[in-house]
Amino acid sequence: MTKIIVRSAALVKQGQLTLYSTSLKVSDLLIPNFYSVETLDPDDDNDKGYQRLLNRARAKRLADYIIDGQETKDAFLPTSIFMATHKNIDFNPTNNTIEINIDTIGPFSVVDGQHRVEGLKMAAEKDTRVLDFEVPVNIAINLPKIAQMCHFLIVNTT
């Protein structure tokens, strides 16, 4: 089943990099094959990723915070998730929207924000109200894997 997501977005150019700044609902992030996190396990010689291994305790702390915020209506997560694809995304400059067809684009690589994504996923599994929670997302397009790795290093060391 194809799901197409249409969201308002701002086109951002930074040198050679093209980004779309938008927001996604947690339910969008949970679409099968929507994202992948390429981790590097130092104990696995065949592992070719670049992300640190997931710290489940850190993700759970975020999940607990988001769930608590559903009751008080004050959950706040302003820090964006940085995703990337080596493909292009359709952008409509007339109405400033992007169209994401995950069957043709996906999965997005999570360059920065794997603990936020996992925490949101954990929260949604416990409280379905979280599915409608929106999070800021920056999506880089036409970005090869090696460039994604470089951006991960820049974001996490600069």
Predicted features, each with a name:
Residues 1-77, 85-92, 97-99:
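N-terminal extension/subdomain marker
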Residues 51, 74-79, 83, 87-158:
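Basic- and aromatic-enriched surface patches that contact anionic nucleotides/nucleic acids
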